[in-house]
Design a protein with these regions (language model features):
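A conserved short beta-strand
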Residues: 130-142
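Short beta-strand/loop motif that positions the catalytic acidic residue
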Residues: 159-162, 166
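C-terminal catalytic histidine-bearing segment of alpha/beta-hydrolase fold enzymes
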Residues: 159, 175-218
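Conserved alpha/beta-hydrolase "nucleophile elbow" surrounding the catalytic nucleophile
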Residues: 26-28, 112-114, 163
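Serine-hydrolase catalytic machinery in alpha/beta-hydrolase-like enzymes
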Residues: 6-104
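Short alpha-helix in the alpha/beta-hydrolase fold that links the catalytic acid
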Residues: 36-39, 170-180
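Gly/Ala-rich beta-loop-alpha elbow adjacent to hydrolase catalytic centers
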Residues: 113-117, 121
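Alpha/beta-hydrolase fold nucleophile elbow
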Residues: 103-113
Length: 218
């Protein structure tokens, strides 16, 4: 089966059965290969997990060798919202393909992403038919709180982490996301990483792994 998004796949080692999937979504201008680096540290602790790292559905407007989930070259909030909704639809189709291919349910799937990928994970995690196992997000935010609050259909629990010195996506968005999620009865844990800019430091990766291990049936 060919997926609708070009995907880097990391299979369980030693031919282990696939019981879980972690879908890793890259940031603006990145690609699936970039974000797949997380699997190098995680896979030995998650022996029955397949990692799927798709490229965004369109080339990045400012970095044509990379990809994006939605265009940021126009800073109009309504335009960004409309583009992100298009990406949501494509991701939901892609996730359904994964579920069919590997005989998985949402409860077997962790959504994880960095920056723009984190934003998409939050939206998909709250607008699906049933809860995913969890969302693990790095350095992201909620794209449009008013729009999202009006279409919540699921309440996937979340772990969100952010660098306190992030100069790309301000760390204030972590606190805003926590407040929004709690107000909408979504279980959330957060971790602010000291002296960290817009990347995924080892502390964030390790904390995220520990959270995933608590939630996935290994």
């Amino acid at each position: 089966m060919t997926f609708s998004l070009n995907t880097k796949i990391i299979y369980p080692e030693n031919g282990n059965d696939i019981k879980n999937a972690i879908i890793l979504l890259h940031g603006y201008g990145g690609d699936g290969n970039d974000i797949s680096a997380l699997s190098l540290n995680w896979k030995r602790f998650l022996p029955n997990t397949i990692f799927l790292c798709p490229n965004g559905h369109e080339p990045c407007s400012i970095n044509p060798v990379g990809f994006q989930w939605f265009d940021l070259s126009n800073d109009d909030s309504q335009y960004i919202l409309e583009e992100s909704i298009k990406a949501e639809k494509k991701l939901k189709l892609y996730i359904n393909e994964i579920k069919k291919k590997y005989s998985l349910e949402n409860s077997n799937i962790c959504l994880s992403g960095f920056s723009q990928g984190c934003m998409m994970c939050i939206n998909v995690g709250l607008t699906s038919d049933t809860d995913f196992n969890c969302v693990v997000g790095f350095s992201g935010k909620i794209i449009n709180k008013e729009n999202l609050s009006n279409k919540i259909t699921s309440r996937t629990k979340m772990f969100l982490t952010h660098g306190d010195r992030d100069t790309v996506v301000s760390s204030i968005h972590l606190l805003e996301a926590k407040e929004f999620l709690l107000r909408n009865n979504v279980e959330v844990e957060i971790k602010m990483i000291n002296n960290s800019d817009h990347h995924i430091p080892i502390e964030a990766s390790s904390s995220a792994l520990n959270y995933i291990k608590k939630n996935l049936i290994i």
